[in-house]
Every structure is written in C-alpha cells, then in structure tokens.
Amino acid sequence: MPKYKYNKINILFSCCLLVSFVVAPLVVQAQEDPLVTQAREAAKEAKPLVQELLHLKNQQQFEKVEQNFEKAQRFLEDNRPNQEQIVEQLKSAKDVQTITKITIDFGGEEIFLDFDEVTKHYLNQPLSAKTVFALTKELTQVLYNAGYVTSAIGLKSSKIKNGEVEFVVLWGKVNDILVEEQQASLFKDKAMLFVLPNLKGKVLRIYDVDQLIEILNTGNKTAKVNVIAANEKSMSNLSIERHRTSYPQVSLSLNNSGEGSNAEGRNQATLSISWSDLLGTNDRWSFSTGYRIYKDRQANRQQNYSLSYTQPFSFSTLDIKLSYSGYKKQLRGIHTHGSSGETKQASFKLSHTLLRNKDMILSLYGELEFKRRLSYFGDIRIGKYHNNKLNIGLSYVTNLGHGKLYSDLSYSNGLRWFNANHSAYNSHRDKTLRLVSGSINWQRPFVFFNRGMSYQFRLGAQYGFDSLYGENQFSIGDEYTVRGFKGGAGSGDRGFYISQTVTIPFYPQKSYLSYINPFLGIDIGKVHAKRPHHVVDTFAGFAFGVKAQIKSLALSLTYAKPINGVGTFEESNKKSVFYFTGSVSF
C-alpha cells in the first residue's frame, strides 16, 4: 500500500481509538474538541525523532568537513617550491652549438610526468656543461614535485651528437617495509603491515608514504615513517616508528541543542568513546550515545546510540556503522496518551583514494544504508517504515586561493531490496528516492591590522527529484547550517545554505589555556517542499561567540539571532538563541 495512504489510515485509526477515550467527557465538555487536537498530535508523533535524526546528520557533515580540513593542513603543501629558472642567463652564452632535441627514457616504467614545461625552454639554447647542468636540475625538480624523492635523472650518454640531449630516469624503489628498522615479529606489527599498501618493489613516491602515515596514525597509535637506504642499489627501506597506548579516549559533553525549554528536553548529555588498534590492523572503533534531559523522565525520553568500525585496506577504507534512535512523548488533551518510536540504521561505506599528491586528494566512495522505523500510539503500532538507499560520491581536498578547499558531491538512489518501502512520492504515486547533494567548504588564513584571522565559507545543497519522506529531507536552522534557529526551522525536498565565519584566534601560551577564539558569522538558507503543501522558506541569521580550550575542557558559546525581513517564519523562530557545548576529554 502506498505510504501516504498508509499514513492517512494511521490517523483515521488513531482517531477511532481516541473516540473510546473522549466520548464520555465530550458529553459534559462539549465546548472542547479534544479529538481533533489529539489526532493532530498523533499525526505529528514522529516529529521529535525526525528532528533529532536531521540534526545528527547535519552534525556528522560538519564534523566530516572539519576532519578533511585537518587532513588538508597535514598533508597538502601551502606553496609550490620555487624552481630556479636560469634560461635567461644562458641566452648570453656564446657557444655555437645549440640544443636541438631533448629525450627522456623512463626506464620501462609506465609513469607519466610532464617534462615539456621545462624542456621547451631549453630548445635552441646554447649547448654547454652549464646548460646541461641547469636542465638536469630542473628535470630533477619535476621528479621531486611529483613525489619521487629517491629517484634521479641523468644523461643517458656523455656523448651528445647533433645537439640531441638524452636523459634517463633512475628510479628509486621500495625494498621492504620494516618496523624499527627490523622485520616485524610481533603479531600486531605483522597485522599492521598486512593492511598497508603493497609498495615492495615499486617506485617510491612520497605521497604513497603519506597514505601510510594517515593509515598508521590512529587514536591509540602514533607513527612516523623513515626512508632509509637499503643495501641494494637504488633501493630504500621504509622503517616505521610506532608508539601504542592501551586506554580508550573518552569524551563527556553537554549541549543545549533542543528547541524546547529545559523541562522539555533542551539539554542533551553525550558520551563518546574511541578506541583503535584493538586488532592491530590500524582499525578504529567508536561508540557514542546522546540522552535528552526531561523534567518528567518517565513520560518523555529521547536517546540515540551509535557504534562504528573503520578498517583501512591499502588505498581503500571500509566504514561500518550501526545506530539506534528512540523517543517517548506524552500527548496531552482531556486524556493523556503516549506516543513512541524508534529508528534502527546500518550503513556500509567503501571509499578509495583515486589520486593523491602535494596539492590534492581525490576519493570515490559508495555506501549502502538500511533503515527501519517503527511508530506507536500507546501500545498500538501505527507505522512501520523500511528504507534502503545507495549513495555514490566523490570527495576532493585541495589547495585553493592560499587556503584549503574540501568539496563533495553524491547521488542517492532508493532501493526496494527486502520489500523496502518507497522513500519519495509525487501527486500520482509513491516513488523511489533520487537526490543529488553536495557541499563546498573553503578555509583560509589572512591578516587584518597585523592580526592573524581565519575565514571559513560553507555551502551545502540538496536537490530531490520528487517529494521526500522524513529524514531524507534537507534541513536547515541549527548551529551547523543557518544559525539563529533550533530544531530544524525548515526542511524540504531541495534547498541550500551558505554559512560564513571569521575567527580571530588567540594563543595565550598559558599552561591552563590552549586557545581562545572569538568568531562572527552570517548565514542564509532556503528550502523548498512541494508536498503535502507547496512551501518555500528562506532563513537568515547572524552569530557571534567564542570557543576555548582549557586543558582537557573544551567550551563553545554562541549567541545567534534571525535576521528580520528575510523570509517568513513562525513567531517562535524570531527570538534569539544561545548554543552551548561543553566537553571534557580524557
């Protein structure tokens, strides 16, 4: 049965159920219409859970952006190395013979390197030892810029005929991967090496070593890779120095992300536990849970749990995630009834690094999501929804405009596997979900009045080809999208947001205070929903606040306010809001 029809039947069924509770009171209280009121509340019974899931999705996207910015800062070079250009000096030489042709022998390796930008400047230049030396130096720099730091380039023959200069690339290769300059003997060390890229016998490229460093450094293990000469000619060993710790990383935090009052679940306590290298395979495990704090904890409850496992394999990474979200809420009329619901989700994501160098990292990923949601009114189940989805996307990290850029683009398609429900609809029938989503995130430092600052730009967008159900919608209006609102002020099948923030970092150099960062931001976003009612909402807000790190305590406080005159929204969304997050890690 189509889902939108199923929901109507659910509401009708709930109304019939409510008649048994309200008929008698209506005889003596005809002035009220509790049936309509409670039916309306029953129709909205899943709203708290959907809001929480959309908020978690925005939070995860925000954290993913921050992680990729950190990766860019660590592995991408800020500036290209200066290449010495001495061609102009060579033009004044008086040698009669000139360079007529330059050839480069790659030694049988199928590696593409663009030497043309260098060689074209040397054609028809005077042929001399000084010229050949300068040319060799620049060709070697091309090798180094491409990451082949143990390779070299030299003359194929010392005899140059008719101005034809022949070069050959002498490739440096990997002989073996060692641990502390020794063959791995411990089980965990062998397991650690087993999942690394197989570089033995291959040309050594420093950006492949970067991949090793990224895989090896987990929360419970720090590692660095040294390149040392091997006994064989043109061969090098990669020696890993590692230090392991035994205890997990634990973080306790408190935030006020809820839209209600303190009694209505505004505050949320969360616990995060990260543990890595348990299997020795550079594996990462994390568990997190969130619990909203209500005044009446027997009648109202909202909690979520998440368990994830990350396993790298060479240039690929497998992510497995299991999550659960549930809620319980009282519906008040003449009689009080409870509504409740839960969502269970499993996802499997495989990502692969396609290209990696000093300027960019390009990755491809595919993800399968399986989701099941149950809804109850009292003890009666009024909704059962099963949804599967396939996501395919690209992520890109690069240098841009003296800053770092992270962008991603993905396509999602609903799957009808295992008798799953449709996840979209139009005016005629239920449909399979199809949507495109992406983000562009740019961050760069700058100096203003001799003060170092940082500017960050974020753009997120989604386009749904049909009307979407529930948590597949695009939501804005929280601390991660358009600040100045709470609870997901607007959602729709398609939309976008733009968030801009200027941060002024201070590093007091105190033992108790690592940093204090005031910031100022302005955001705008728009969502469009076609059904059940055609709605276009625009939201804008500004924010200012401060973030600080005091030993193991991290604090963030933000004041944000909607910008009046931009869009039309409910009166409850016109008030200023405060976002607070405090966490302690150990």
Swiss-Prot record:
Residues annotated as signal peptide: 1-30
Q: Which UniProt keywords apply?
A: Cell outer membrane, Ion transport, Membrane, Porin, Protein transport, Signal, Transmembrane, Transmembrane beta strand, Transport
Where does the source fall among the domains of life? Bacteria
Query: What is one term from the GO cellular component aspect held by the record?
Result: type V protein secretion system complex
Listed InterPro entries: Hemolysn_activator_HlyB_C, Polypept-transport_assoc_ShlB, POTRA, TPS, TPS_OM_transporter
* Keyword Signal among UniProt keywords: yes
Gene Ontology BP terms: monoatomic ion transport; protein secretion by the type V secretion system
| Keyword Cell membrane recorded | no
Query: Which is one Pfam family of this protein?
Result: POTRA_2
**Cell compartment(s), UniProt:** Cell outer membrane
Domain POTRA, by residue range, is 97-172
Could you tell me one molecular function GO term of this UniProt entry? Answer: porin activity
Task: Tell me the disulfide pairings in this chain.
Answer: none
Query: What is the purpose of this protein?
Result: Possible member (with IbpA) of a two partner secretion pathway (TPS) in which it would mediate the secretion of protein IbpA (high molecular weight immunoglobulin-binding protein).
Q: Which family does it belong to?
A: Belongs to the TPS (TC 1.B.20) family.
Free-text domain note: Probably a beta-barrel protein.
Descriptive protein name? Outer membrane transporter protein IbpB
Q: Which organism is it from?
A: Histophilus somni (strain 2336)
* Source taxonomy: Bacteria, Pseudomonadati, Pseudomonadota, Gammaproteobacteria, Pasteurellales
Coding gene? Answer: ibpB
